[in-house]
């Protein structure tokens, strides 16, 4: 830190983690400049990020400037959960079939690993786009195989528990199907 005048931190919403906090404190103790960047200015624990916000680029502005398209929302109404899961899966297949590029990938979000297996079976029964499952309880080899199928476009549907999380970079991920909590489909 003695040789550096500035510290630049990307993904700053993680900067409260003990290692980052200790690293930052060395710079702050020496009155060095710390600049933090994040597209997610919210911490998991609900506490605010430290420091002064000097620039905000809202999603609405990014959409207006053409970086993101507006979200197209489709909802599925059913009083029967099993039927709703099938209807959402069918809508995902419909959206993927309508994709002119043939490159879009869909994420089907569920709340538990048991639900992931159940919802995966629904997508598999529809017989399109070779769905795979990804969650933290999978063995590393199985998770890598599923990710490889997505990367190589052998699969275009991934069933996951909650969201895929930080570091999951797949620009072709355009469709989000929420099987738990909300029964909806968001297409970007």
Task: Report the location of each language-model feature.
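Conserved helicase ATPase core of P-loop NTP-dependent helicases/translocases
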Residues: 130-133, 138-162
């Amino acid at each position: 830190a003695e040789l550096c005048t500035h510290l630049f931190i990307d993904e700053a919403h993680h900067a409260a983690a003990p290692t980052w906090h200790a690293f930052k404190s060395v710079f702050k103790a020496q009155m060095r400049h710390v600049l933090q960047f994040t597209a997610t200015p919210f911490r998991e624990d609900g506490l605010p990020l430290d420091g002064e916000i000097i620039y905000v680029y809202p999603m609405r502005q990014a959409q207006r400037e053409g970086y993101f398209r507006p979200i197209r929302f489709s909802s599925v109404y059913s009083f029967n959960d099993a039927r709703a899961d099938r209807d959402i899966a069918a809508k995902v297949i419909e959206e993927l079939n309508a994709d002119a590029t043939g490159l879009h990938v869909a994420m089907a979000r569920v709340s538990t690993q048991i639900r992931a297996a159940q919802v995966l079976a629904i997508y598999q029964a529809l017989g399109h786009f070779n769905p795979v499952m990804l969650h933290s309880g999978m063995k590393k080899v199985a998770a890598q195989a599923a990710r490889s199928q997505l990367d190589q476009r052998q699969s275009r549907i991934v069933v996951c528990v909650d969201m895929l999380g930080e570091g999951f970079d797949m620009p072709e991920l355009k469709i989000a199907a929420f099987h738990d909590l909300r029964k909806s489909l968001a297409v970007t």
